[in-house]
Amino acid sequence: MVLSRHVTADKVLKEAREHHDKHNSHRGRAPISELLGRDEPGQLQAHPLSDRYETEPIAKYKLSSQGMPDKEAYDLVTKELSLDGNPLLNLASFVHTRMDEYADRIMHENRAKNLIDSDEYPATTLIHSRLISQLAHLWHADDQKEDATGTATTGSSEAIQLAGLAMKKRWQARRKAEGKSFKEPGPNIIMGANAQVALEKFARYFDVEARMVPVDESTKYVMDPKRAIEMVDENTIGIFVILGSTYTGTYEDVGEMARLLDEYQAKTGIDIPIHVDGASGALYAPFATPSLIWDFRIPRVVSINTSGHKWGKTYVGCGFVIWRDKQHLPKELVFELHYLGSVEYSFSLNFSRPAAPILAQYYSFLQRGFAGYRKISLSDAKNARLLARALERSKYYHVTSEIHHLKDPKDQSLVDRAKQTVGALDDIELYVPALPVVAFHFTKEFKREYPRIKQASIQHLLREHEWIVPNYELPPNAEDMEVLRVVIREGFSEDMVERLFTDLINVTEQLMDEHKAEAPNPGEGSGRNVSEEKKEKDQGKQVGKKLTNVAERLAASHGEGTRPIGHDGPC
């Protein structure tokens, strides 16, 4: 959750009025609230007919002494929420935003169920157990004949804390058994500087030193196992390896990290486990690239987490963590509960949690099956490659992510090479395994020619078209580079890729036109901007030409002729 500071309404409103008065006195006008004629700018305004029910204004920052009719409250909330972005067009988020009618019914019909109450909801508890088994099987715990165990969580952030705690407790037990201190110098955990904040939270919240492996262009902005192994010592409780970086979608190399740790153990006798942060990748990679070995097939991987509400295709609030066997989940972390009607075992950071998202995950697994998830995953990857290629063909952008890169020849099989030779480039096995994420930035040539254009302006201009595309700095040691990022999720079709690309190129060229326009020299008066006159003269012609160019670029990246893009106009 985002932390929110308590707002003292009277104090804030007083300061706001004083600020407006002071700020606007320099401009010679009255405060905004006075111009609007608002006597109570700190109050919510209800429907004009609501005064028949009300005895006082509706407070924003404190509980009103009187309520209001349900319809009025509903209208007030929905009107405020209308200013939120459209979840489907929120390309910043990895979180799934749409389920079908029957999933919605399951969510609605089971919204009152508490997952912790297993005695009251035995069928729900059974479904939870089945999900743990299904995930363990998907991640090949069965292949290793392991007695896997796990639990549902509210998401990967909680799952990461649980996995980290298990590794810390096992490290402490080992230190005690060896007669060594577990307090000085204390435990450490290793992760890339590209780690999502939940991984850093574990270290800070549970007093573990976070050793951040520097990342840069040479490491593809993810953790390099060779750099990570240099930070390992006897106090390392484990290594977080990320299957799908938040920044670029790139997978970290689980197999290579395990190999180096095997060598380290052979030399020192110190056994250091791996936890795979598969928040996104653990429910994408098994379907998109099942030949990729990253899971429990690697003996050093002791636990894996994932978010069902990402590529598991459920609404937010669904996550899981699985341990390869019971010995990697210390008994002292598991609580035995006797006050819910039966004996229950729990390992979580909170007690109550909604059952509905977990039931929706079960429905999604049943409804899609492996084939359905694979079909969606392949479509997501194809659309991500389409967008990435189009961006690079535009000559304005360089794509940092790797979803569209062919594998290094040394990593290709004979079949892969044969497919590449005959031009069968739609096979995902030919490409570098990665999430369907497109991270990109201005090319060096573009920056040289248009030095005053800020990349952040693209984010703001796209928002005018309702697209939510973040512009952010890369991790420490690479923070001088900013990237824009698009996450391709289910429902983001090829047509939507075309529409996004069209808008992106148009706003880019809009900024280019503004950059080229020369302002009048001092002493020439307040003449009009050159580009404004040009736009008035042939605006329709320029827009038509621009859209045609966009269509040609996208079609070229897709291997087809130019196609009509009539949907770009208003219906």
Could you describe each region identified by the protein language model?
Residues 80, 94, 192-194, 242, ...:
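Structured loops at beta-to-helix junctions and adjacent beta-edge loops in soluble globular domains
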